[in-house]
């Protein structure tokens, strides 16, 4: 039966990832549990929520090989509260899993290992590797515009697709569009799948982990599943959304009549300040643009009003340039602008306008492989 010795700090992070995968209100006991498998000097932790399956391996001192399943939440809550020290985990059979730490001991009920689902196999139609840094970049640049409307299920994830040597991620909620891509080292089969929001968020946490961020991630694609293998010790298999993502190229404006170039941080900070006055029912800020100034204003029902003026400047920290003699007043949901401005770290941002009702194209000169489109609102 399973018996192993492990450092608390080694176990706590893996349990954090596992707990994040497991649904908080899972009514099926097997899916609320985590499977612990001790073998060959490693502890494998397996967790699932039926739509995605996470397997992690960490180095431990295996005294006796074996496996068992226990409540993910309970085990995670216990380990997080323990001081840094050695833990001994022992499967005692009918009396459960014993967790022995410094001056403390816990016994957790277990379920039969046979009731825990195994990770499905995948027959990949395409596979490739990219750096975790690049993968994190395209997911972070697009995840915020995923639709939360469950009736539009084909928009409830990020559209991962390969076209020639470009690996792209795109998402839209009907009001905004986010596209980010990286160039692969070699050309592979063109492909397109919709990764659910939950799966995108979970794999993003893993690739951003300090021990993985400088590694590569292998991606295996099939028509209904995707598998990620990171650092050889972590793999995640996810179901895909069965739907067709819209041809987003038709939403990207091809021309514009005016252009705003502005310091990204200054612009983001100003919008965030003015947005405080707005209310959830109708969130809108108005941008009034001219060659000399940008005025950002808002009126909040039962709150008041706010205004901030940015003057034309060529200084790096306060750069503002509007290239049209025709003034423009246009409204936006401030959250949509804030999300874009926070997604890409760049000194300046460019906004391309056609008229007050047309979608606005947003680009970052230092990050040419990120494109955003935001619909304006009436103000």
Curated annotation (Swiss-Prot):
What is this protein identified as?
Beta sliding clamp
Keywords of the record, alphabetical order, are: Cytoplasm, DNA replication, DNA-binding, DNA-directed DNA polymerase, Nucleotidyltransferase, Transferase
Alphabetical list of Pfam families matching this protein = DNA_pol3_beta, DNA_pol3_beta_2, DNA_pol3_beta_3
**Which GO biological process categories is it annotated with?**
DNA strand elongation involved in DNA replication
**Which N-terminal stretch is annotated as signal sequence?**
none
Q: In which domain of life is the source organism classified?
A: Bacteria
| Function recorded in the entry | Confers DNA tethering and processivity to DNA polymerases and other proteins. Acts as a clamp, forming a ring around DNA (a reaction catalyzed by the clamp-loading complex) which diffuses in an ATP-independent manner freely and bidirectionally along dsDNA. Initially characterized for its ability to contact the catalytic subunit of DNA polymerase III (Pol III), a complex, multichain enzyme responsible for most of the replicative synthesis in bacteria; Pol III exhibits 3'-5' exonuclease proofreading activity.
Cross-referenced Gene3D superfamilies, in alphabetical order?
3.70.10.10, DNA Polymerase III, subunit A, domain 2
Subcellular localization is given as:
Cytoplasm
Q: What is its main location?
A: cytoplasm
Question: Which family does the record assign?
Answer: Belongs to the beta sliding clamp family.
Cytoplasm is among the record's keywords: yes
Q: Which PANTHER family match?
A: BETA SLIDING CLAMP, DNA POLYMERASE III SUBUNIT BETA
Keyword Nucleotidyltransferase among record annotations: yes
Q: Which Gene Ontology terms cover its molecular function?
A: 3'-5' exonuclease activity; DNA binding; DNA-directed DNA polymerase activity
Sorted alphabetically, which NCBIfam families does this protein's record hold? Answer: dnan
Q: Which CDD domains match?
A: beta_clamp
GO cellular component labels: cytoplasm; DNA polymerase III complex
Q: How does it assemble?
A: Forms a ring-shaped head-to-tail homodimer around DNA which binds and tethers DNA polymerases and other proteins to the DNA. The DNA replisome complex has a single clamp-loading complex (3 tau and 1 each of delta, delta', psi and chi subunits) which binds 3 Pol III cores (1 core on the leading strand and 2 on the lagging strand) each with a beta sliding clamp dimer. Additional proteins in the replisome are other copies of gamma, psi and chi, Ssb, DNA helicase and RNA primase.
Q: Which InterPro entries match?
A: DNA_clamp_sf (IPR046938), DNA_polIII_beta (IPR001001), DNA_polIII_beta_C (IPR022635), DNA_polIII_beta_cen (IPR022637), DNA_polIII_beta_N (IPR022634)
User: Which cysteine residues pair off into disulfide bonds?
Assistant: none
Species annotation: Rickettsia conorii (strain ATCC VR-613 / Malish 7)
């Amino acid at each position: 039966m399973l018996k192993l010795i492990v450092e608390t700090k080694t176990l706590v992070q893996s349990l954090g990832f596992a707990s994040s995968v497991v649904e908080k209100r899972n009514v099926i006991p097997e899916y609320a549990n985590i499977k612990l498998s001790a073998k060959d000097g490693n502890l494998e932790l397996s967790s699932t929520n039926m739509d995605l399956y996470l397997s992690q391996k960490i180095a431990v001192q295996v005294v006796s090989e074996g496996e068992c399943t226990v409540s993910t939440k309970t085990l995670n809550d216990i380990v997080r509260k323990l001081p840094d020290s050695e833990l001994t985990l022992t499967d005692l059979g009918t009396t459960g899993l014993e967790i022995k730490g410094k001056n403390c001991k816990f016994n957790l009920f277990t379920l039969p290992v046979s009731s825990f689902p195994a990770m499905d196999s995948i027959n990949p139609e395409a596979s490739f590797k990219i750096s975790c840094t690049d993968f994190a970049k395209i997911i972070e640049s697009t995840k915020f515009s995923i639709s939360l409307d469950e009736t539009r299920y084909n928009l409830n994830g990020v559209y991962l697709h390969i076209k020639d040597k470009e690996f792209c991620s795109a998402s839209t909620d009907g009001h905004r569009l986010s596209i980010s891509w990286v160039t692969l080292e070699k050309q592979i089969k063109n492909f397109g799948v919709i990764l659910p929001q939950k799966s995108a968020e979970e794999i993003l946490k893993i690739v951003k982990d300090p021990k993985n961020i400088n590694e590569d991630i292998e991606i295996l694609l099939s028509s209904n599943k995707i598998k990620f293998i990171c650092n050889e010790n972590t793999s995640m298999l996810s179901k895909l959304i069965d739907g067709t993502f819209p041809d987003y190229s038709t939403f990207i404006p091809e021309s514009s009549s005016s252009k705003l170039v502005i310091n990204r941080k200054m612009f983001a900070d100003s919008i965030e300040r003015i947005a405080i006055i707005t209310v959830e029912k109708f969130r809108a800020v108005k941008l009034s643009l001219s060659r000399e100034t940008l005025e950002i204003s808002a009126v909040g029902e039962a709150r008041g009003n706010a205004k901030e003026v940015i003057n034309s400047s060529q200084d790096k920290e306060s750069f503002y340039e509007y290239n049209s003699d025709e003034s423009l007043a246009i409204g936006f949901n401030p959250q949509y602008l804030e999300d874009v401005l926070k997604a890409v770290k760049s000194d300046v941002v460019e906004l391309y306008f056609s008229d007050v009702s047309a979608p606005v194209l947003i680009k970052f000169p230092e990050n040419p492989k990120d494109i955003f489109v935001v619909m304006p609102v009436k103000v």
